[in-house]
Amino acid sequence: VAGYEKNCMTSIRLVLTAALLVPTGLMLGACAGGGGGGGSAVTPLSPPPPPPPPPPPPPPPPFPATIAQPSAFETREYNATVGLPLIGASSAYAIGATGQGIRVAVIDTGSITDHPDFIGASITTFDVCASTACPGYDVTGDSITQIRQSDDIDTGGHGTLVTGVIAAVRQDDFTTSVDDTVANGIQGIAYEASVLAIRADSPGSCARTGQDEGCAFADSNLVRAIDYAIAQGVTIINMSLGGEIDSDPTLENAVRRAAQAGILVVISAGNEAEPAGTDDMGNSVDAVGQTPSEPAYIAGEAASLGRVVAVGSIDTSRKISDFSNRAGNAAMNYYLMAPGEGVVTTGLDDNITNPGDPTNDLDSDGDYYRVSGTSFSAPYVAGALALLLDAFPNLKNNPELALQILLDTADDYVDASPDLITGEVAGAGADSVSGVGIMNLAEAFRPQGQQTLSISIDRVSLGEALAPSGGAFGDWASNSGAFNGLVFQDKYDRGFRLDAEATAKSLPKGLLGSRVVDMNTRADWAASQSRAIAVGDLSFAWFTPRVQEDRLAPYQAEPVTNFQAAYSFSGGEVEFGRGGGISRLAPVVTLFNEPGIGNAFSTSGSWARVSHEIEFGLTMDLFTATEETRSLTGVSVGRDARFWSFRAGISSASDEETALGGSLQNRFGETDQAAMTAYSLEGEWNPFGRLTLNSGMEMASVDLPGVDTQDIWTSRWSVGATHPAGPGALSFVVAQPRRAEAGTIRFLAPTGIDDRGEILQSDVEAGLTPSGRQIDYETRYRFTLFGDWTGEASAALSTSPNHISGSGDESVAWFAVGTKW
């Protein structure tokens, strides 16, 4: 036989039925070498007649979308496999992944197609030796080149066992529990994937007995099988076989060709692991199985292009199987573990595997077997790759990403005890014992790394897209519902449907910070030096905050001095200044900041007002204010009388730094800014000479440059009362800072994925109103103590800060005492 022969990586145990597994029993040898065992077989009981097939489930909605909770798929036949629950496969099914449209080549001993669990499955077969002579054996076990004879079958059914792990049809309807107790059948991990079962065992090898018992594979046969799979355009190749590493690179080169063709190649690591010991003669024997066998050992080499993986086995307690070859150093980053001990799959009829056994059932259907070996770990990984490629079409263009996802999301395998095969400890991270760890589909089907939305022409993080804007727009992004169901991408560019409400709730609290004024700055101004002079109709006042003496920072800039100047003339007044702001009739809350365009500008801003009396006792004010990034210009008309005053105005304002005190356009790749035209009405009433009532309201039409918005209107209002009390005056203010009351934004958003994995975008319209309404309450008492000493005590409460419903209330208190110097 040309080339070193490879063997099946398996030992199997028969089960009585799919519902009643054999608790104890002897091993039935299926393949020679690679850890196969020999002995008598336990015969299955006659299974109950199969139930009528359930009605097909309704077609799932287009992916990505959750069609049911994972628990809905954890049916009897799911759990009967033993392996699927160990890797969390139900998480893949929950979002509609089935393997549909993915073709997996199983290079093995062939597969039957009429097993009860293959009815409806897409399984095609090909035999590389059916019409072309292959290296093989005659009836005496001597080497011969021949085509396969019709009676040359693998009575162990190794290829059928492997195929069942991948593609056994799901019978349970996840939408109902009616059939969950049906006592027959299992399901494959990728139960809607198609399988190309390529038979490549050497003709006559499966019929050998004695020391050479079991199916064997010549390198040349395997090469032909791989080349055939490449020619057929399969997506994944599963090779549940292997042997000793030799110097002939023919087989390895064929695997590399498959990888270069864009095919993912999944190979059993081997079943040769044996700890060091002594032989029958008492001689010391070194441990074996420290590395994957041939051809799995090439996983991880550069020529494999990240598309070849070696698969080891774990038992039902998630411990590495004694027989499983370890990862070794060269392949450890491409060595993954999956269930391979005590799992249940489809097999040949017991009359073929155990002919003449009186306990065999009377039918000629296939049966179910409990099996062990890395032969069955590999198809779990092959099926998992099919699920990923089905669910995330973008991975088809870069199939190595699908494999990388499984490697990156594997559960790290840590065992503090030195491994009996390698003598090393399976520590944190990839290691020579367990490679990257145990496959975890629940994690593999979760978004990984940075998660982004392709909005308009920009790609922004979910946190940035859904973060509350603050200012007038609050939490519009999550409140609008427009982001629900959009498609976001993870670091592998996979698409997922967005649950915007849940994502927004998971964002860190306090992203917008506190709106309480800076108490240090307020204290500095309370302790400021103030001067004022007046000469005739001209007055001038200035205020300089105190300098903080900090020995750790002795060279501080001098504080900015604010000033106010006024000149009165017949019928009018001119007033200008820096800092503070234009006086208003409407009351304001002093202990909370109103970001953006408020009543006043920062201490660095300048302002001016011209007042002129017109007819009917009315006064017209023209005013303007500027700061580095904000400007305000307007006109108002009002009247000041003894007991009452009012003012109506219109103003134009712009802010080049924020969207009305928040951040909105930035998530669309534009600069936060705003322009608005505001209409205001404010008044003051002093009905009894002592009680003063004042209020103000504003409605504004808003434009947000850089984005497509329509009909944005905001509101803002305040009411207050002041009354003398003892040696001072008590004031109470209730105010709502500027809030968006109407308006929409239209933007291009990712709404779907096509069958090539390309993001599909369409226009989405979202409301800009926030979920809550911030109301601020403030009480102030300003009083005289004695002489020139004065005091102030204030307390304020803000409910639904930043107009976000359910956000925690904020409160603050202030007390100051001062005197003239």
Where are these predicted regions, by residue range?
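Transmembrane beta-strands of outer-membrane beta-barrel pores
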Residues: 546, 578-584, 622-628, 650-656, ...
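Repeated loop/turn-to-beta-strand initiation elements of outer-membrane beta-barrel proteins
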Residues: 571-575, 614-622, 642-649, 654-657, ...
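Extracellular S/T/G-rich loop segment that most often corresponds to the catalytic His/Ser-adjacent loop
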Residues: 108, 129, 296-386
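Substrate-binding/access-modulating region of protease and related hydrolase catalytic domains
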Residues: 32-44, 63, 98-99, 169, ...
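Hydrolase catalytic cores
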Residues: 163-166, 170-171, 198-201, 235, ...
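Active-site core segment of subtilase-fold serine proteases
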Residues: 62-194, 202-213, 217, 224, ...
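C-terminal subdomain of the subtilisin-like protease fold in secreted/lumenal serine endopeptidases
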Residues: 80-82, 227, 236-238, 307-310, ...
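Outer-membrane beta-barrel "beta-signal"
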Residues: 725, 729, 779, 783, ...
